[in-house]
Amino acid sequence: MAETSSYTDAELRERLTPEQYAVTQQAGTERAFTGEYWDCHDDGTYRCVVCDTALFSSDTKYESGSGWPSFFEAVGPDVVEIRTDTSHGMIREEAVCANCDAHLGHRFPDGPAPTGERYCMNSAAMRLERDTAED
């Protein structure tokens, strides 16, 4: 897996779409109900669009009503790093890829059991590696 730091800014701008760059590198937020995965029900693994790290399983995805893909748990304890975000006059928990530092979205304490957490992610920060049907 490649880390963000191994890419120059010019390389990141070339390999990411403008929206992916704005979200992952500038802590942007896509508009609600517009991202590719907000209403996606396909099975698979959601990976970081920058470094391809596995972040979330579709098994932990749920409909939060927020308009963004929401998950109650990451695939492992060390794949998503949580940081304090004080932008826009709020105190929130920013979720970033622990491997490459890409901004993914935010974590809120209003999710379902068993964790009570809602990882509210930007579709632009992820790609879905769909499960393949077994023959």
Each language-model region and where it sits:
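A short Gly-Trp-Pro
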Residues: 3-135
